[in-house]
């Protein structure tokens, strides 16, 4: 016989039994045992609370006197707990997005704030942190070559509400937009430009395309910087491209060296040409003046020559010979002389041998067959000589 099944058990006819031998006397009137009555449970709870706080008697719940006070105390404690748990803090670099009953309400600033708990929901968002993502992969160029390109994008959150609720996942959306923009820009560029001189243009074009995508989708993000990390050809042709790049770098280096040499030597050559030009002009003027002086001197001697030609010729000859022999140490003696005693200053003659040859102060233009220009190796030694008014030459 099952438990609580009606039957004849030790004279308990028509009464329910339980395994402990107790009769279910509380279930009188022939009612079957079922789930507890909620009204009865609440009534019993109210009676217990009423008795504990001073309520007596009565079959129903008593809300007067001490029972009301007890409920008031419990309610006050619950309200206090609810109120104090509503305080929260937003960091200095954060902004809080408040949703009231699931609908956007406002954005709160950093500091201590309060919200009605279970009504408002606050999501803090860092708006000052610089975030980074990388896009890379094999990409097809305009000239149908394949390159491996890698690019880093740095960004931050400009609008917390748009960042959270305008798109499903703003970070993932930006990653996909970066990959798409980079592939579009690389697809419009030549491989040689990507590997060498066109990286700056690719970086600027990618950043401009990303800004257009962010504005069109209203993501609430701001691009801080775009860094072109690397671009390399496939491994199968990497050696050939490295040789081509090295040759191009050598070409650029040689061009820079040539430009530097030109910038160094051109001012020197220009200055030297100007100096030689001025010296030539000075020599021209000096030669003309000397010739005019000689002409004037001969014109002055012309009346004397016409009066006594032989005497004037002899005097001019002696003056010329004296001028010629004055710069030499050789002494000419007439062997047919009358034997007169000659005085020869040996010390002065020996001193003239040790002297360096000095240029003649007056030279005619016919004496200069050519002018020897200074060489570059002796330029420093002839700077002081070039300042003099008399130009040295060979004749």
Curated annotation (Swiss-Prot):
Taxonomic lineage of the native organism: Bacteria, Pseudomonadati, Pseudomonadota, Gammaproteobacteria, Vibrionales
Protein family per UniProt: Belongs to the band 7/mec-2 family. HflK subfamily.
Record's keyword terms, sorted: Membrane, Transmembrane, Transmembrane helix
Membrane-traversing stretches: 67-87
Composition bias, Polar residues: 353-395
Protein name: Protein HflK
Entry keyword annotation includes Lipid metabolism: no
Gene it is expressed from: hflK
Gene3D superfamilies recorded: Band 7 domain (3.30.479.30)
GO CC terms: membrane
Organism: Vibrio cholerae serotype O1 (strain ATCC 39315 / El Tor Inaba N16961)
Pfam family, one: Band_7
């Amino acid at each position: 016989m099952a438990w609580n099944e009606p039957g004849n058990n030790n004279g308990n006819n028509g009464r329910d039994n339980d395994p402990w031998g107790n009769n279910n006397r509380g279930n009188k009137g022939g009612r079957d045992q079922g789930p507890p009555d909620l009204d009865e449970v609440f009534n019993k709870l109210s009676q217990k609370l009423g008795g504990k706080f001073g309520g007596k008697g009565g079959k129903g719940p008593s809300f007067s006197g001490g029972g009301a006070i007890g409920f008031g105390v419990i309610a006050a404690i619950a309200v206090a707990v609810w109120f104090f748990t509503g305080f929260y803090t937003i960091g200095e670099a954060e902004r809080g997005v408040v949703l009231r009953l699931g609908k956007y309400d406002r954005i709160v600033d950093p500091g201590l704030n309060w919200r009605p708990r279970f009504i408002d929901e606050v999501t803090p968002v860092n708006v000052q942190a610089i975030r980074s993502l990388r896009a890379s992969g094999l990409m097809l160029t305009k000239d149908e070559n394949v390159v491996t390109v890698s690019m880093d994008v740095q960004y931050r959150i400009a609008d917390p509400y748009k960042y959270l609720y305008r798109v499903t996942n703003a970070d993932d959306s930006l990653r996909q937009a970066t990959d798409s923009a980079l592939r579009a820009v690389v697809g419009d560029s030549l491989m040689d430009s990507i590997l060498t001189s066109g990286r700056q243009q690719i970086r600027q074009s990618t950043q401009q395309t990303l800004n257009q995508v962010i504005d069109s989708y209203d993501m609430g993000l701001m691009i801080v910087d775009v860094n072109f990390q690397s671009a390399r050809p496939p491994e199968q042709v990497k050696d050939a491209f490295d040789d081509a790049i090295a040759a191009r770098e050598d070409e650029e280096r040689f061009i820079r060296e040539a430009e530097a040499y030109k910038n160094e030597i051109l001012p020197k050559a220009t200055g030297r040409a100007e100096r030689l030009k001025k010296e030539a002009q000075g020599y021209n003027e000096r030669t003309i003046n000397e010739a005019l002086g000689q002409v004037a001197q001969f014109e002055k001697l012309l009346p004397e020559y016409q009066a006594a030609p032989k005497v004037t010729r002899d005097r001019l000859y002696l003056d010329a010979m004296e001028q010629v022999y004055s710069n030499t140490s050789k002494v000419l003696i007439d062997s047919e002389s009358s034997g007169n005693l000659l005085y020869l200053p040996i010390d002065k003659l020996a001193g003239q041998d040790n002297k360096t040859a000095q240029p003649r102060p007056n030279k005619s233009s016919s004496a200069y067959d050519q002018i020897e220009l200074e060489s570059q190796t002796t330029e420093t030694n002839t700077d002081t000589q070039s300042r003099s008014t008399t130009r040295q030459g060979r004749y």
